[in-house]
Amino acid sequence: VVTLDPAAALAGKLYNRKDISYFITHPCHPSIFNWEPEEEKMKDHFGGNLAKQAIVCSLLQGSEEDYALGEAIARKFYAPVWKAHRITTEQMGLLEPALVETLASTCVFVISEGLKEVIKRGVPAEAARDFLLGHLRIQMAVLFNELPGAVFSDAANKALRRGLNEFIKDDWRKIFEPDNVKEQIIAIT
């Protein structure tokens, strides 16, 4: 049996049968740092069509042969795939929902709301969007080491610290605790 994310497995919603194998996979989607030579490929934001992407794979139960078959199926299903990462089902739950939905989607949503706010306060929409998206690109490149050795300016670091103190709770990492991850999964399944 192939499932397309870890939620059902981690919520205990898969039948407990020892006579079948469970393989879990999910696309990483094309990275924001992915580069494709053709514009049409660059616009394949979800992946599984034209743009290359990585995938994550887990064998919940079964043999190594079952894993190999599952990965081969996943590579075809999500093609073009440039890399398959083998991780545990629990690690996949840390990635989704905790990292990419609960944390990243929330942060990106707040950023998009900030864009709407500066537009509401009079900044021309096109200028605000161009300014934000350009800065997001360089911020992501610095923070994710796409520009080795690059750092934020002193002023940018001061603004970052101020933002962390103003609207990020000190205990935000609790979303990665096993019980919290399970609560997230139960809430969405």
Question: What spans do the regions from the language model cover?
Answer:
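NAD(P)-dependent Rossmann-like dehydrogenase/reductase catalytic/cofactor-binding core
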Residues: 50-54, 120-189
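General structural feature for long, well-ordered alpha-helical segments within catalytic domains
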Residues: 66-70, 110, 128, 132-135
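A short glycine-threonine-serine/GTX helix/turn-capping micro-motif
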Residues: 96-105
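Short acidic alpha-helix initiation/capping motifs at coil-to-helix transition points
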Residues: 105-111
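Rossmann-fold dinucleotide-binding core
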Residues: 3-96
